[in-house]
Design a protein with these regions (language model features):
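Conserved mixed alpha/beta catalytic, RNA-binding, or beta-rich assembly cores of soluble enzyme
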Residues: 1-94, 99-243
Length: 243
């Protein structure tokens, strides 16, 4: 269990060389990167050191979408689109589609929690109920912007946006205590309620265990598995968990 994405933000007036070096360092983590960058030249330099890992370039808006589209298309990466409101987001997304780019994600983050929630729900509703394909892309919700510094609030909002249509959720940090309920919640969202939550029977090596490691066993009920495996991983002892 780990953070699957790393968001690397490029603030206004950031130094291109420093940002590129930070992106290169983040790429070494082996996680998918999301580059929050609105400057086409800086974005191009950053993508040069990480494009093979297929990052997301989150930086297109009404003022720069043509240049950002050219950068993203050349690198073959997903382009994130934002707008000052839903109308601008829609128009910019439609303009990118006319340029032939449908490899997009929508940044639905607003000025505050209320606006962000409304944006995210309305975008998904337009795609599903109104069959509007222009809003039929995954969404990014940046909790750092709407709850900066409040880690507990970010964790609470992450649970809400997991259920209410956030495809990529950006937080300042992810501790084990925050990750466990959030990952369990995400798993439940994509679980068939008519089927019991079970773990596939098999042998699960923990902490670098090999064939000579200690063997322990537990039942296949998913909640039990996650509780037991979490405790065993924290012990640091190499062992094989048999389900």
């Amino acid at each position: 269990m780990y953070a699957e994405l790393v968001y690397v933000n490029c603030g206004e007036g950031a130094d291109a060389a420093k940002y590129t070096a930070l992106v290169e360092k983040a790429a070494g983590l082996g996680r998918t990167l999301v580059l929050g960058c609105k400057d086409p030249e800086i974005a191009k330099a950053a993508l040069a050191v990480c494009k093979d890992s297929k990052p997301v370039l989150n930086g297109a808006d009404a003022s720069n979408y043509e240049a950002m589209n050219a950068v993203a298309t050349e690198a073959g990466v997903v382009l994130g689109v934002s707008g000052k409101d839903l109308n601008e987001l829609y128009d910019t997304t439609a303009a990118l589609e006319k340029l032939g780019n449908k490899n997009l994600v929508l940044d639905t983050t607003g000025a505050d929690i209320k606006e962000t929630f409304a944006n995210t729900v309305q975008v998904r509703r337009a795609a599903l109920k109104d069959q509007d394909r222009t809003f039929g892309y995954p969404s990014i919700v940046n909790l750092v912007k709407i709850a900066k510094g409040d880690l507990h609030l970010q964790a609470a909002l992450a649970s809400m946006f997991t259920m209410k249509y956030g495809s990529i959720i950006v937080m300042e940090q992810m501790t084990y205590a925050e990750a466990l309920p959030l990952y369990g919640l995400r798993q439940n969202v994509f679980t068939d309620p008519q089927k019991p939550m079970k773990v596939e029977p098999g042998i699960y090596p923990l902490n670098g265990a090999d064939e000579n490691a200690v063997v322990v066993t537990t039942v296949d009920f998913a909640l039990t598995y996650f509780v037991v495996s979490g405790e065993l991983e924290r012990s640091g002892v190499p062992l094989n968990l048999v389900i």
